[in-house]
């Protein structure tokens, strides 16, 4: 039981700390490296990861076009890389 309590406390400290970002996990684009954005997880919009910008032929979201974003990105997809645009291709949007 003591170990369980310690794990819970550790998880709470991690969840509410704003000073440290675990590698790959982010809150905003500014915390990610060049060529990436802070995209929402496909499973939970409360969890975000640094994800590479879209390359030619990769799926994109038409409303996700600015890096760094002014707020928290809601899409699980990053904008397209420099020089590419997000356009509709059949049923999906792709970087081209």
UniProtKB/Swiss-Prot annotation:
InterPro entries from the UniProt entry: Prokineticin, Prokineticin_domain
Family: Belongs to the AVIT (prokineticin) family.
Function: Potent agonist for both PKR1/PROKR1 and PKR2/PROKR2, and inducer of a potent and long-lasting hyperalgesia. Also potentiates capsaicin-induced TRPV1 current, when tested on DRG neurons. At subnanomolar concentrations, this protein both induces potent chemotaxis of macrophages and stimulates LPS-induced production of the pro-inflammatory cytokines IL-1 and IL-12. In vivo, potently stimulates the contraction of the guinea-pig gastrointestinal (GI) smooth muscle (nanomolar concentration).
Tissues in which the UniProt entry reports expression: Expressed by the skin glands.
Alphabetic keyword roster: Disulfide bond, G-protein coupled receptor impairing toxin, Secreted, Signal, Toxin
Main location: secreted
First and last residue of the signal peptide: 1-19
Protein name from the UniProt record: Prokineticin Bm8-f
Domain of life of the source: Eukaryota
Paired cysteines (S-S): 26-38, 32-50, 37-78, 60-86, 80-95
Tagged with keyword Signal: yes
Gene Ontology cellular component terms for the protein in this record: extracellular region
GO biological process: endothelial cell proliferation
Organism: Bombina maxima (Giant fire-bellied toad)
GO molecular function: toxin activity
Localization (cell): Secreted
